[in-house]
Amino acid sequence: MLTHLNGYKREAVLAPLFKMLEATFDLFVPLVMADIVNVGITAHDFHYILVRCGILLLLAAVGLACSLTAQYFSAKAAVGYSTSLRHALFEHIQRLGFTEMDTMGTSTLITRMTSDINQVQSGLNLFLRLFLRSPFVVVGAMVMAFTVNVRAAWIFVVAIPLLSVVVFGVMVITNPLYKTAQARLDRVLGLTRENLTGVRVVRAFDKEKSEIDRFESANDLLTRMQLHVGHISSLMSPLTYVIINLAIVALLYVGSIEINVGGMASGDVIALVNYMNQILVELVKLANLIVQVSKALACAGRVQAVLDTEPGMEFPAALKGEAPADKAGDAVRFDHVSLTYAGAGAPSLTDISFTAKRGQTIGVIGGTGSGKSSLINLIPRFYDATEGTVEILGRPAQAYPRAALRGSVAVVMQKAQLFGGTIRSNLLWGNKNAADADLWAALETAQAADFVRAKPLGLDEPVEQGGRNLSGGQKQRLTIARALVGKPEILILDDSASALDYATDAALRKALAALPGDLTVFIVSQRAASLQHADQIIVLDDGRMVGLGRHADLLKTCPVYEEIYASQFKKGDAQK
């Protein structure tokens, strides 16, 4: 992760150097104050006092300039570092496969991208300003104390190690606790995201109370951990103040004895107390630095864990091999394919075999959890088969570069997802170079042209994030049109017409069949009516293929398909 600081090496060096320069000027302030008391006030020399006060103002002004310069460089380095790290993390996440995304979870990745990197940025900013300054002032104040009075300076030698034990002891104890607290924060964020995403379902089933209880339980665990860490961290300040105040009392006692015997002047005592106060201030800063850096290191470790996660699948740089002549007509071929998700106890698909020819329409039907989405997710290689082989257009799916495979296979997901922008910008996801004529052709096929024309701005009509200003059916038709803009060779509709009425659904299927070329269409649907005219229908039950054939044949040979069909049409044969 430190490589992201390479572009800011100059700032990372100059920030602590200017802070040390500021600290150097601060260390001379007590000596000047001692001179004012020992010489100016004792001799009633007003001119001497004014000159020394001018020196104090000059030291303060130069110190302020150094401090502002250091702040500028540290902020520039920290912000630049976090920006580079955030870009790298986002780019890495884009390369991760569905398996890794499923394992880590969306809420976890959002936390890494936002609060974790912000914490790293704050920690780095503080570190660059204080990691040299605070120790330098602590050691420098002790050295300067020896120049004032050796006997009194030994109090510093005793106080500083005691303070260090307190500060570093708290750090060692709290560092692992911060990691636990952050993990519990992830849990709270995950529950929040899940609840807000499914708020309609929660209210539809009157589950607000149970969701509140679940959130309060997770939030209570987080609160208790944060309080536990806070209680331990809060010990640092009183313990350090007790040690410092005892040291000041000792200084005053030793100073009074030394003054009585003529070993030091009263101004020297003031200088020593000032040095002790400087040590107190810097150790408080150092304690805060350690706490913040501990948090930042914990967050950095979590970000690094994501960066260390390698994609589970690799794509070749170029297309491998030629499609065998005997498979030239194949669009998709599954050969004894099984799929088990990472961490799952049982396979989601078992021993699936079929061949879809170019230009065919393939229906996929089955009950909830039967493996329909799992099957079609293997075609664009969102996941790799655990067993068996998946061939696309005559070649193994692993032979295709990512762009080539995703360009040949277009998927319309179950959940219609649109992005903030315009209708045009969303459609151009399919092909950024598509002309307006191509966009309108795709809209016509997707049965979306009429409602887009009815919009005041047509293709330039704004689309809110997630398509909130569109109905469910409109969003589904636009996502289908977006897939068609890319002119794929294989189109997968994963239950993506569920919000369409029967007439629009039928018109969509008719328009897809009329498209030129050999477009192979996979239609995943709960409606048997949507699949009646498919060239082949795959019937799934509990991850196994229990039927394969045309509609009429399956009614005779596949009890599962017959049951699905009967459950949908026994009350309304007019829908056949």
Give the location of each predicted region:
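A short amphipathic helical element positioned immediately N-terminal to and/or at the very start
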Residues: 1-9, 109
